[in-house]
Every structure is written in structure tokens, then in C-alpha cells.
Amino acid sequence: MSEKVGAMGGNKGGAFDDGVFDGVKKVIVGKDFNNVTYIKVEYEKDGKFEIREHGTNRGQLKEFSVDYPNEYITAVGGSYDTVFGYGSALIKSLLFKTSYGRTSPILGHTTLLGNPAGKEFMLESKYGGKLLGFHGRSGEALDAIGPHFFAVNSSLKHFKPQGGNGGSAWDDGAFDGVRKVLVGRNGKFVSYIRFEYAKGERTVPHAHGKRQEAPQEFVVDYPNEHITSVEGTIDGYLSSLKFKTSKGRTSPVFGNVVGSKFVFEETSFKLVGFCGRSGDAIDALGAHFAPLPAPTPAPAPAPAPVPVPAPAPVPAPSPAPAPSPAPAPAPAPAPAPTPAPAPAPPNKVEALGGNGGTIFDDGAFDHVRKVYIGQGDSGVAYVKFEYEKDGKRETGEHGKMTVLGTEEFEVESDDYITSAEVSVDNVFGFKSEIVTSLVFKTFKGITSQPFGMESEKKLELKDGKGGKLVGFHGKASDVLYALGAYFAPTTNSITPSTPSTAKKLQARGGNGGASWDDGVFDGVRKILVGQGNDGVAFVTFEYNKGSQAILGDGHGKQTLLGTETFELDYPSEYITSVEGYYDKIFGVEAEVVTSLTFKTNKRTSQPFGMTAGEHFELKEDGYKIVGFHGKAGDLVHQIGVHAVPIFTNYRCVF
């Protein structure tokens, strides 16, 4: 459902109405010496992009793009004024506000003070609804313009945003359902949320806030499962979130449960969208719920056929009775199947380190997939473990993250951790020993880098039976005091001779920003690169998975310079290597990526950025690139890739 807001401007020219789309990706505005003469809008509908143009005199063109579909336009503003000799008003300038809290440059004419020239206007939905289309009037110029915004359908149950009035309002709208939720924190508050919605067969992501710490995720088994309840707390900002589903599952609590509590829940309804307010944190959160579809009635059983009686058979004369054979001996009863032995319980190995802090115990899982380690001034201040249990990912985090961020160690799918080396030391200001460094070793012989500062006292955390590490426990507060683990027996069904299909090539660049990893997909469809004044400020990648195009998270921060696009002819074209440069720039502590160039099996892209500094190349012969990882803050500090073998089909001719 949409809300049509009245057009601002003059009453000449011919009326136009583009109608309602799924969203707006890009707006191009042209001007002459006096007013706005032309507008070109790139809309998206059901995964396809459509263009609408109004006005005829293109003049001087300027473009405004959003990080679509994560970001969308929430307000349309500008100015209009009467033009001498025309007898009516024309649009003199346009500007746009987005769900990221960004405001576009003024596209058109300004005053000497840099404000829109003429009578200013700002058109927006009451709750920050998404821009879905434009209407207005045009001839040789743009006479008037108005927007269509998303509006809540009367069949939906709308929960108004709970929280403060800071930040910018946004409303993602209503979809078929929710596939995944990602929640990121910054200290005690929720600073970032990303929702992956279902729209038919497509996945539509929307992100809000500022990504700082690595987000945690909650995956819904859509379409077999849906979210029935959203619970959270507000303490000035959003401080925690929790979800319940139709299968009786409850997500982990994301954040700290402090402040006033809210619950969004409606019997026989399911969650289909979110709204709220955000800036550098999530100020407020609301939701849209839709009624569950009525269950399809079971078909009535077909009536059973009426049996037709067969004619009575004529009895044949009875033969002479044969002598009865001796009865066969009864077969011996089959032996009862031997029940499979119950798996041995995991072995809990005592924590190594000091006695400070609070005890934590994550328990035992099927696998440890990834470890994040954050350093402090004196040792390991923070750890986060990413586990897998029955195919589902869970996380446990302990300690306190510092401004130094985190480093990570990822375990390949055909490998597992067998031991950890724990360095401990007595550090001034702490009453007991603390963990100063961690090193992890795996079954395939991989040894991680030392995370932290190694000390003379090194302790080995293992069970002595060749077991597989499946969970952690220990003690922590503002630092990690002690670390122990659970080990499960293994039959070594995983062998080092079976390599993982995908290779993760080490990221190149500086050590600033927060780690990110998009993961492994079938291929790459499109790359968007945004430049800053001194290097690459922003990247995002559109991947392919099965039959779906999936737009990954944006990494870095977009600037007013916008983005440039490199689009592949997928699936016949694929990336074979990434080349680039990284360098130290004034005012930034760690090196940043200054340039990126992408090579495919068909061509080479233009260089995005400035080719200055240390050169690098990410390439594996016989492999194609199917995912990216790295580090980013306000700039892109590192870039790395995931690559898989290229398989070629050969035809034999006889």
C-alpha cells in the first residue's frame, strides 16, 4: 500500500505519474541557467530495473545514488519559484534524505549561502516510509514533483517504534517474511541491524545504523518457519533484542537487557517488516505483522466404491485327503539388534590462567567454526566464539572489546581445533594472572598467528586423547583471566588429504577497522566501489547463490563522490584475480586500500582509485573468486578473497 503526497511546484506542463515500484536506486537531475529541466529515475521492481525520464532539456547533469537495497530514500525536498516570462513556477532544486541519515547534495540552483534557491519544501512520510515512485508535471522542464511513499496496509498490525527521537526515521515496508536478522553492538547499545526479507524467491536486505563490532545473526527456516515475537529493551537507545519463532525457537539475546522492555506480538500474525529511527546507533524500533494465511482445507475423501458381490463358486469334488506332512520346526527367533553405543560425553578440561573475573561456560557443540580475539593494553581483552550445533550457528562472547577491534581465526569446514596455547602473566593493576596471548592448532596441521602478547609462561590446552575442541569455558570481566575447553572424541573421519573446496586467500592492506567476511557464493555479479579523497572508502558486492542475486553488506563509508560499478556477464564471466594498492595516508593510523582492479576470464576493469603505494595481487591459478573478506572502518583497510576451482565441461568426439 502506498501514500501519494501532493506535488510541489507549478501547474503547467503535462501531468505524469510513474506509479509504485519496489524502490528507487538512482536519480539524475539536469539544470539550465534558471531551473531544473530534467529528471531521470532508476526504479527497481521484482528484481528488474526500469527507467523513467521527465523534461526534455537535459542541461548540466548531477547524480545521486543510494546503497540499494540496503539504503532507500525517505524524503524528497528542494525548491521552486515563478520564472519570468513563463507565468508559472518551475522546480529550481531537488535534494533527498535516506534511511542511512544521509542528505544528498543540492541538485540544481542554490543561493550564495548554499541553500536551495526559491521557496523550499520537504515531502516525507510520517514514519519514514520508503520512496516508491514519483508523480508531477513536466514539459521542456520540471514543473512540479511529488512522491509515492510506502504506507501501512490496514490488514497489517503496526507496532509504533519504541525508543527515542534521535536519528532519522525509516520504514522498510512489508514483505512476505523474514529470512535472517543480523545485530551488531557498540558497547552497551545495539548500533547496527540488517534484515534479510523474503519477496517471492528473492532476498531483499535492508540495513540501519552503523556497523562497528562484528554482528551476530539469527537465521529463520523460511518459508517453513516465521518470527512470531520481537522482544527488546530501550535504555536511551536500543539495548537488546530477542526473537521467537513459529517452531518454538528463541534466539539468543543480542545485547544487554537493560532499560524499559517492549514486546511486539500478535496471535495468528507473523513478522513481515521493521521500521524505526537510527543514526550511529538504533534509536527506536517498530514492526509490521501480517495475518497468517488461512490453512488450506484438506480435500474431502472420495467415497469408497460399493463392492459388487461375486457369484458363488460351484464346489469342485474333493480329492482324497493326502497324508499330513510332519510340521516344520519353528524358526529360531532373530537376535535382537545390538543398540549403537551412545556417544561418549565431551571431556571438560580445566581452565588455564588466573582466578579473577566471572565464570562463563558456553557448553559443548558440534563444531567451532570461528574465533574472534580482541586485544587490550596488557593482553587478551575480548573473545567471541562462533559454534555450530545441528547445522545452526550460535555465538558466545566474553570480556570487553576495546578500540583496537578484533582479529579472527576461521576453521575450515573439513578441519577442527585440537589444542590452544595459552600465554598467561601477572600484569600490574590486576590481582591475578590474565591471558596475554592465544594460539590455536588444528587437525590439518594449521597453526594460527599469536593473538595478543606472548609471555614466558605458555600453557597448552588439550585433552591428551587427540580430541576435537567443541566448546569453551573460563573467566572474564574487562579482560580474559582464564580459558578452558570441551573436547569430544573423534574417529578422524575428517582427513587432512581431503582439502576444502574453497580457498580463503589472506587479505592485503593495513590493520585498521573491523573484520568482515561475506562468505562463499556461487559467483560474483556486480561490484560497487566508492572513492574517498585519498583511497577506496566503500565496497559492496552482488553475489549469486542458486537462482538468487544477493547483495552483500556495504563495507566502509560512502562519500559524496558516490560509487562506480563493474558488472559481470554472469554466469559466463567470472573474476580470476584482484589487483590493488595500499598506502599510508595523512590522518589515518593504518594503511588503506587506495586502488582496486578486477580481472575476469574476458576482460580487465578500470582501476578504481589511485594507483599509489604497495602493490598486491590476489590470485590462485585455476580458481575463480566467489566471495570477499577484509577490514573496514570509514575507509577500506584490507581486501581478501574466497576462491574455488574452475570446472570446465569437455565434450568427447568419436
Curated annotation (Swiss-Prot):
Gene Ontology MF term list: carbohydrate binding
Protein's UniProt name: Myrosinase-binding protein 2
Keywords in alphabetical order: Lectin, Repeat
Induction per the UniProt record: Not regulated by wounding, dehydration stress, methyl jasmonate, salicylic acid or abscisic acid treatments.
PROSITE patterns reported for this sequence: JACALIN_LECTIN
CDD domains found in the cross-reference section: Jacalin
Keyword Isomerase: no
Gene3D superfamilies: Jacalin-like lectin domain
Cross-referenced Pfam families: Jacalin
Sequence similarity: Belongs to the jacalin lectin family.
Record region (Disordered): 314-355
Source taxon at top rank: Eukaryota
SUPFAM superfamilies to which the protein is assigned, alphabetical: Mannose-binding lectins
Encoding gene, per UniProt annotation: MBP2
Tissue localization of expression: Expressed in flowers. Detected mainly in ovules and styles of immature flowers, but also in pistils, styles, stamens, petals and embryos. Not detected in leaves.
Pro residues bias spans: 314-346
Jacalin-type lectin domain mapped to chain residues: 2-151, 156-291, 346-489, 502-645
